[in-house]
Amino acid sequence: MEALAVDGLPEIHEGDDLAALLEDRVDFADGDVLCVASTIVSKAEGRAFDRESFPPSDRAKAIADRLSTITGEQKDPRFAQAVLEESEELLTESPFLLSVTRFGHITVNAGIDRSNVPGADLLLLPEDPTASAERLSSALGVPVVVTDTSGRPFRYGQRGVAVGWAGLPAARDWRGETDRDGRELGVTVQAVVDELAATANLVAGEGDDGTPAVVVREWSFGDHDGSDLLFRREEDDIVREALRQWTFDGHQQ
């Protein structure tokens, strides 16, 4: 398997034909998977905004005031309003905003980016990343994973995750197959789109040296059952329920 950065992409603007820009730079082949950063998908889809686009509600002002008190830094209620508008639910309002996005992804600040947004203040995630992936996959003829960088519970550091995908299942189901000793596997479901996203993030890098698209070549899903169930169902998610019941005590570590 190879993971190859796509070099030479220009700064992306609203209305740019992302598929054409990628096709000009990559000779796609059977077995390729394109991993593309949500940032350039969002830019092409016009998801860059100024803070003034989000007049703050009373709730946003209260959130910003509380976060300012906790952190000792002035927080902008317009940013809090943007997070509220992009969230189906806020699982925590302090010491940070942990959002359930409208497409089911759970992440800090609804995944809103405040870096690498020339001419604007905020870059929102694609409105429907899987629909975005489907359009790119249809145009390019290869599976597509739309990636984002996200933190991890219980561990420091960030990694690439999938927020949308098309042309391949999200997960590979090993249940019912056997290990090397002949024992049947009962619980193993491999989140392949997340693993592809993490691979792409490792190759793409971050900051000024980063590239927003990576082609994973000669990787195969194999002869396994697949599933598109990536986001845990609410009724099965004990961590989500625990967060709803948790109250921040005012002491930031």
Swiss-Prot record:
<feature type="binding site">
    <location>
        <begin position="9"/>
        <end position="12"/>
    </location>
    <ligand>
        <name>GTP</name>
    </ligand>
</feature>
<comment type="subunit">
    <text>Homodimer.</text>
</comment>
<comment type="similarity">
    <text>Belongs to the CofE family.</text>
</comment>
<feature type="binding site">
    <location>
        <position position="206"/>
    </location>
    <ligand>
        <name>a divalent metal cation 2</name>
    </ligand>
</feature>
<dbReference type="GO" id="GO:0052645">
    <property type="term" value="P:F420-0 metabolic process"/>
</dbReference>
<dbReference type="GO" id="GO:0052618">
    <property type="term" value="F:coenzyme F420-0:L-glutamate ligase activity"/>
</dbReference>
<keyword id="KW-0436">Ligase</keyword>
<comment type="pathway">
    <text>Cofactor biosynthesis; coenzyme F420 biosynthesis.</text>
</comment>
<feature type="binding site">
    <location>
        <position position="116"/>
    </location>
    <ligand>
        <name>GTP</name>
    </ligand>
</feature>
<protein>
    <recommendedName>
        <fullName>Coenzyme F420:L-glutamate ligase</fullName>
        <ecNumber>6.3.2.31</ecNumber>
        <ecNumber>6.3.2.34</ecNumber>
    </recommendedName>
</protein>
<keyword id="KW-0547">Nucleotide-binding</keyword>
<feature type="binding site">
    <location>
        <begin position="38"/>
        <end position="39"/>
    </location>
    <ligand>
        <name>GTP</name>
    </ligand>
</feature>
<feature type="binding site">
    <location>
        <position position="149"/>
    </location>
    <ligand>
        <name>a divalent metal cation 2</name>
    </ligand>
</feature>
<feature type="binding site">
    <location>
        <position position="113"/>
    </location>
    <ligand>
        <name>a divalent metal cation 1</name>
    </ligand>
</feature>
<dbReference type="InterPro" id="IPR023659">
    <property type="entry name" value="F420_ligase_CofE_arc"/>
</dbReference>
<keyword id="KW-0479">Metal-binding</keyword>
<dbReference type="GO" id="GO:0046872">
    <property type="term" value="F:metal ion binding"/>
</dbReference>
<feature type="binding site">
    <location>
        <begin position="204"/>
        <end position="211"/>
    </location>
    <ligand>
        <name>GTP</name>
    </ligand>
</feature>
<dbReference type="InterPro" id="IPR008225">
    <property type="entry name" value="F420-0_g-glutamyl_ligase"/>
</dbReference>
<dbReference type="Pfam" id="PF01996">
    <property type="entry name" value="F420_ligase"/>
</dbReference>
<keyword id="KW-0630">Potassium</keyword>
<dbReference type="InterPro" id="IPR002847">
    <property type="entry name" value="F420-0_gamma-glut_ligase-dom"/>
</dbReference>
<dbReference type="GO" id="GO:0005525">
    <property type="term" value="F:GTP binding"/>
</dbReference>
<comment type="function">
    <text>Catalyzes the GTP-dependent successive addition of two or more gamma-linked L-glutamates to the L-lactyl phosphodiester of 7,8-didemethyl-8-hydroxy-5-deazariboflavin (F420-0) to form coenzyme F420-0-glutamyl-glutamate (F420-2) or polyglutamated F420 derivatives.</text>
</comment>
<keyword id="KW-0342">GTP-binding</keyword>
<keyword id="KW-0464">Manganese</keyword>
<keyword id="KW-0460">Magnesium</keyword>
<feature type="binding site">
    <location>
        <position position="43"/>
    </location>
    <ligand>
        <name>GTP</name>
    </ligand>
</feature>
<dbReference type="GO" id="GO:0052619">
    <property type="term" value="F:coenzyme F420-1:gamma-L-glutamate ligase activity"/>
</dbReference>
<feature type="binding site">
    <location>
        <position position="148"/>
    </location>
    <ligand>
        <name>a divalent metal cation 1</name>
    </ligand>
</feature>
